């Protein structure tokens, strides 16, 4: 994208210099094609005596139309035009650096220059609608009655750029339209008419736009743009480029890109202070460290990719995003925030990825009351929610439900899918609630060793030991959560995996249905070791920081688990305040070996030169526990785990105990030292 921007950015200084040196010196110069004249004031301000009207439209043609800082007046006294058209017929671009004012009755103003229009400190007064365009002007004359005609204005655009310089563009307008092949905004564009029906609209790319000139210049209840068509020209250019110094502020803001493949890139601020922000393109839309804020709705749409990086997108009402792919990510200044006072709706024909950013619907007041609607994500492909190194990935509905539907997988990686209401996840593929884990040496399997050294008298120097390494968790403070406060958690998928994460409903049910396998597992990290060295004396030392993370499913009500092939709880905990029902051919309750260390380096043994230590191995987790009953529709297998219910445990196929939960010392071969025989 940046390569496409270079020609436009580099051309701006040349345009400014070229116009200021020659064409700007000429200012506003009629070409003689219309009855238009110009007079110059002592301050340098120019007055344009506009041509008589046809159907309420005054058409004026120029070889040069540039406005210096002294400004220019369009004299509408005695003409009473509703619309004043100013079109440049030469090859000179236009530069507007001052005020353009309508003398006399208020009028709509159109400036059309196919060679390009640059505004740097320009403003408009006593105007209704203002159109800046690089299109060619034509007219559509409509006979309303004998001798009565309405002349509509048509702008056909296929080239030229509108550039807003650092000085910006301002006015109190019914509406501002920017129509060009390309649009570059390097300064503030402000329409001070605060109304949800007035604003700023950009139509960028090849297009033909028709304006109904019958409307009064004071009528902000009707849109005078009655039609826009586009040939669908293919382009990979960045059609709209807004720099960090640029911005758009109005009652309503619309950016519409017509060319196929052309996109929008914004680092600036877009603010609709009374209505909506709408950005529609046929290429990629990229908002990086910029902001979109609307007092009503924000709508973003493209068949391409929408990427929000460190961006702030907020709406008082709804946020609606539709794209081929949607990607939210954080950067060094901070996370992307996509939030709405009511509902957030993201729809993708591809994938949706949220990395280290916040998607939130609704608000929570200081007194704890909540308002708002749902967070709804729908993707034909995968939905991925992950945390970054610095920021959590969060999807949160403050008052409604959080609902994710994917044609592929739903992956919640070290991130959080939350709701004060209900949570619903539906995937044609797998649902994974996981944390990042780097495996230890030997795959977490224990390793024992013995080393025999030199001898002294009848003593042999022997060292024996034991090590186990479960690896590390990248960020133990960023566990994966799927949680609902006042509603159920419902998950439907091909396979379900909760590895190191937490799934919970505070006061309702958790229901998980997997077409194939259900797996709930704690992730174990840390190392355990034991070393014993004997020669004349024996010295032993033990250590363990083995810790389980997550693997928790809990509900204030009932828990329902359905698996087509197998249900496994590996070192985790499944707990229900109500009942647990597992509908699967076979259900495994599997403990994972944890370790604790005991060291005795003082006392009687140490007095004689020896120290004592021990490693205790125990089964951790693998339990299904309910205050109500636990019901298995198939077989149950205990491998270091457990099934327990306050109202009993039943299994249609019976329960087989392969290994009951145990706690035993790890046995290491002992070797004789001088004092060992006293306490072996």
Which sequence ranges carry the predicted segments?
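Binding/recognition "hotspot" determinant
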Residues: 159-160, 164, 220-221, 282-680
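Solvent-exposed adhesion/ligand-recognition segments of exported proteins
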Residues: 2-6, 15, 20-273, 280
């Amino acid at each position: 994208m940046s390569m496409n921007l270079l020609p436009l950015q580099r051309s701006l200084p040349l345009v400014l210099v070229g116009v200021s040196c020659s064409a700007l010196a000429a200012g506003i110069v009629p070409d003689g094609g219309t009855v238009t004249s110009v007079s110059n004031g002592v301050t340098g301000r120019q007055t344009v005596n506009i041509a008589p009207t046809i159907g309420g439209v005054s058409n004026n043609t120029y070889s040069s139309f540039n406005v210096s800082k002294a400004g220019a007046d369009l004299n509408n006294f005695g003409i009473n035009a509703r619309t004043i058209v100013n079109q440049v017929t030469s090859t000179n671009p236009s530069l507007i650096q001052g005020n353009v004012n309508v003398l006399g009755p208020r009028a709509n103003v159109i400036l059309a220059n196919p060679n390009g229009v640059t505004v740097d400190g320009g403003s408009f007064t006593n105007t209704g609608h203002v159109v800046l365009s690089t299109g060619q002007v034509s007219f559509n004359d409509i006979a309303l009655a004998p001798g009565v005609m309405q002349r509509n204005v048509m702008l056909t655009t296929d080239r030229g750029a509108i550039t807003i310089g650092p000085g910006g563009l301002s006015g109190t307008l019914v509406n501002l339209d920017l129509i060009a092949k390309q649009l570059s905004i390097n300064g503030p564009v402000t329409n001070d008419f605060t109304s949800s029906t007035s604003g700023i609209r950009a139509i960028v790319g090849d297009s033909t736009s028709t304006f109904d000139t019958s409307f009064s210049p004071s009528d902000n209840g009707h849109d005078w743009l009655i039609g826009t068509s586009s040939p669908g020209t293919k382009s990979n250019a960045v059609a709209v480029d807004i720099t960090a110094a640029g911005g758009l502020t109005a009652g309503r803001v619309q950016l519409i890109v017509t060319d196929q493949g052309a996109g929008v890139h914004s680092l600036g601020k877009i603010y609709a202070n009374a209505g909506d922000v709408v950005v529609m393109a046929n290429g990629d839309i990229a908002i990086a460290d910029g902001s979109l804020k609307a007092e009503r709705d924000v709508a973003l749409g493209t068949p391409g990719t929408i990427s929000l990086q460190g961006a702030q997108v907020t709406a008082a009402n709804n946020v609606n995003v539709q794209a081929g792919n949607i990607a939210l990510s954080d950067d060094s200044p901070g996370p992307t925030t996509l939030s709405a006072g009511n509902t957030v709706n993201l729809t993708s024909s591809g994938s949706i990825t949220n990395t280290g950013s916040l998607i939130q619907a609704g608000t929570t007041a200081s007194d704890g009351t909540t308002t708002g609607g749902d967070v709804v994500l729908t993707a034909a492909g995968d939905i991925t929610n992950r945390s970054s190194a610095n920021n959590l990935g969060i999807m949160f509905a403050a008052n409604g439900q959080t609902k994710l539907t994917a044609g592929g997988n739903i992956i919640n990686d070290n991130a959080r899918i939350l709701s004060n209401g209900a949570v619903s996840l539906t995937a044609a593929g797998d649902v994974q609630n996981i944390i990042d884990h780097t495996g230890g040496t030997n795959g977490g399997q224990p390793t024992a060793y013995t080393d025999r050294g030199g001898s002294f008298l009848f003593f042999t120097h022997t060292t024996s030991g034991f090590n186990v390494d479960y690896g590390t968790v990248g960020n133990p403070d960023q566990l994966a959560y799927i949680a609902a406060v006042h509603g159920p958690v419902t998950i439907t998928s091909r396979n379900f995996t909760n590895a190191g994460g937490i799934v919970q409903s505070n006061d309702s049910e958790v229901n998980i249905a997997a077409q194939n396998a259900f797996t709930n597992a704690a992730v174990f990290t840390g190392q355990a070791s034991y070393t014993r060295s004997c020669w004349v004396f024996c010295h032993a030392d033990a250590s363990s920081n083995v810790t389980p993370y997550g693997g928790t499913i809990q509900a204030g009500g009932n828990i329902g688990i359905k698996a087509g092939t197998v249900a496994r709880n590996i070192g985790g905990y499944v707990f229900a305040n109500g009942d647990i029902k597992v509908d699967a051919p076979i259900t495994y309750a599997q403990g994972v070996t944890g370790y604790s260390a005991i060291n005795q380096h003082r006392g009687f043994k140490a007095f004689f030169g020896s120290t004592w230590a021990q490693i205790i191995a125990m089964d951790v987790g693998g339990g299904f526990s309910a205050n109500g009953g636990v019901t298995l529709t198939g077989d149950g297998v205990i491998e270091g785990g457990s099934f327990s219910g306050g109202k009993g445990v039943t299994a249609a196929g019976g329960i087989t105990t392969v290994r009951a939960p145990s706690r035993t010392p790890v046995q290491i071969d002992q070797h004789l030292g001088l004092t060992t025989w006293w306490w072996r």
